Swiss-Prot record:
GO BP annotations, alphabetical order: protein quality control for misfolded or incompletely synthesized proteins; rescue of stalled ribosome
Annotated site residues (Discriminates between blocked and unblocked aminoacyl-tRNA) in this chain: N9
Main location: cytoplasm
GO molecular function, one term: tRNA binding
Catalytic activity: an N-acyl-L-alpha-aminoacyl-tRNA + H2O = an N-acyl-L-amino acid + a tRNA + H(+)
Primary role: Hydrolyzes ribosome-free peptidyl-tRNAs (with 1 or more amino acids incorporated), which drop off the ribosome during protein synthesis, or as a result of ribosome stalling.
Subcellular location per the Swiss-Prot or TrEMBL entry: Cytoplasm
Family: Belongs to the PTH family.
NCBIfam families according to UniProt: pth
PANTHER family membership: PEPTIDYL-TRNA HYDROLASE
Name of protein: Peptidyl-tRNA hydrolase
EC number: 3.1.1.29
Site (Stabilizes the basic form of H active site to accept a proton): D92
């Protein structure tokens, strides 16, 4: 069993914002594999299915971003899985170029409050994550306002491709492991972690 968690904020006002790309990625995965993410369980919307022959649970915590760890901790416990080996967390990253994908096996939160909440709840940085870049081309004066702003029409094609790439990264991880996924998607060197991301609530 693998747990695939997308991070975001619940509520229509946040649905199509950069900070909710984790939720949107889970929605894309669910669409591709015919999984219905509609059960309320462990403070999250969840759905069970099979991807590449692997039993999976897709989850979107409904706790608001900064409390994501509470939901993830409950899910890991209920599913009786090892969060360091059997979980993939998908989230937005303000330090990566817009629309890019990076697969990472461990590391700090890099300023992302949802990831920090998970690290705190599980007491480890050792879990697989797929990061979706949301860094704009212009210099930001207010990161919080930006990550919670509505996606612009001009950004949608890039976002659409990024969501497909995130779904493909999950498939590669489940079929071949994280190494091949990193080789495929981590094509450019990562910028240093700036801790510049500001999460909502």
């Amino acid at each position: 069993m693998k747990l695939i968690v997308g991070l975001g904020n619940p509520g229509m006002q946040y649905q199509f914002t950069p900070h909710n790309l984790g939720f949107l990625a889970v929605d894309r995965i669910a669409e591709k594999y015919g999984i219905r993410v509609a059960n309320r369980n462990c403070k999250a919307l969840t759905g069970r299915g099979v991807i590449e022959g692997v039993d999976v649970v897709l989850a979107k915590p409904e706790t608001y971003m900064n409390l994501s760890g509470a939901s993830v901790q409950e899910l890991v416990s209920e599913l009786e899985i090892d969060g360091t080996k059997d979980m993939i967390v998908i989230y937005d990253d303000l330090d990566l170029p817009y629309g890019s994908i990076r697969v990472r096996e461990r590391g700090s939160a890099g300023g992302h409050n949802g990831v920090q909440s998970i690290i705190g709840a599980l007491d480890t940085q050792e879990f697989l994550r797929i990061r979706i870049g949301i860094a704009p081309e212009f210099k930001l004066s207010d990161g919080a306002s930006y990550v919670l702003s509505q996606l612009k029409k001009s950004q949608l094609p890039v976002v659409d491709q990024a969501l497909d790439d995130a779904a493909e990264a999950v498939k590669v991880i489940l079929r071949e492991g994280p190494g091949p996924a990193m080789n495929r998607f981590n094509r450019k060197p990562e910028p240093p972690e700036s801790g510049g991301e500001v999460a909502a609530k």
